[in-house]
Curated annotation (Swiss-Prot):
Alphabetical list of CDD domains matching this protein: HisRS-like_core, HisRS_anticodon
Keyword presence, Aminoacyl-tRNA synthetase: yes
E.C. no: 6.1.1.21
Main location: cytoplasm
Species assigned in the record: Elusimicrobium minutum (strain Pei191)
UniProt xrefs under SUPFAM superfamilies: Class II aaRS ABD-related, Class II aaRS and biotin synthetases
Protein name: Histidine--tRNA ligase
Domain of life: Bacteria
Reaction(s) this enzyme catalyzes, per UniProt: tRNA(His) + L-histidine + ATP = L-histidyl-tRNA(His) + AMP + diphosphate + H(+)
GO terms (BP aspect): histidyl-tRNA aminoacylation
GO molecular function terms listed in the Swiss-Prot or TrEMBL record: ATP binding; histidine-tRNA ligase activity
Amino acid sequence: MTKLVRGFRDIFAPESNNFAELEACARRVFTLAGGTEVRIPTLELKELFIKSTGDTTDIVQKEMYAFEDAGGRVLAMRPEGTPGTVRAYIENNFAQTAPVQKLFYIGNMFRAERPQAGRYREFEQIGMEYIGNPSPAADAEIILMIKDIVTSFGVKNYGVKINSLGCQECRPAYKQELINYLKKDFDTLCEKCKDRLEKNPLRVLDCKIDGARFKENAPKQKLCAACENHFNEVKTFLQGRIDYIIDPSLVRGLDYYTRTVFEFQAGDSAQNAIAGGGRYDSLVKSMGGADMPAVGFAMGVERTIAARGETKDNKQNKIFVVSLDKNCNAKAFEIMSLLRSAGVICDGGLFDKNLKAQMKQADRTKSSFALLLGADEFEKGVVTMRDLSSGEQQEIKFNDILNKVGKIRL
């Protein structure tokens, strides 16, 4: 028997209802903010992620599903949504035709990580890339969108951290200071961090092995005046709208971030990040596009669902149509189609089964009411509607079904 690939899973109701609910919350928030949806390919050229995500990141070095196709192209299944969205922005010439874009995506990503509780090799992300707006207001707007999504979804216990990584003007001096600090303990660094030290020392502070022991005493970022003003304005826009703490050690795990970075965490652990992102003013240009500022975020759907801590059944009144006689099948099918056309959730159609089997299926599907149609009912022009919770039942004329059922459908 063919089995599921390790690290992947099937998702059924009621758990799948949570995915649909969170997606709906996000779409509502994005739409109210003027966002438009982009659907990017699952496959991209591997080079795209090397240029954007960064060749020193774990994602590129170890976690991408990459392969050579029959045409000799090296492709990769997307490990994150930002590079593909930015590529789409560049390739479709938005910089010239409509430079300011709020592009959101909802889709599955793929990383060859070690499977563990709550973490899979295929996972869903919700994200937005706000391209073309250099204002600190855009940073704050993105952060508040995340807040609106998680609160409307029902996540109660979460915290928010923010920081500024500076820009190309002020970051080099800080990076050198950080390198000098970390070199004192070079021999104790993990192999990954030894490699990162010269290329991107900020990533050492994000390391799961070494990060914690260096964060507290690491030198603090010294922002230039422009970055200081930008960060202060972000905080002004957030004031009174969301609680947050400033964490100088927050660096995020990708190479392209500049200035503002942020992270939403469920509970107290940094390993429980449910969403994060930041500004990346150089990414569009580095990928071959115009010199275009941008800020964005990604939210882990599975992690956000886990943070809420409950699985909703989303129970709705459902009608199950039962036919007791083959001569009634056509009428039963007509009733089933009529109810669906009127927006009533309606199941049935097991007309080759006996009454017991059909009623058992009605119970399995958690139907609220059954409409029974047999020879006697057909002769009288009625159906019997049975409340499957109380057992109470009543006869309803064919021409009154919509009126009666419509009153109890939700």
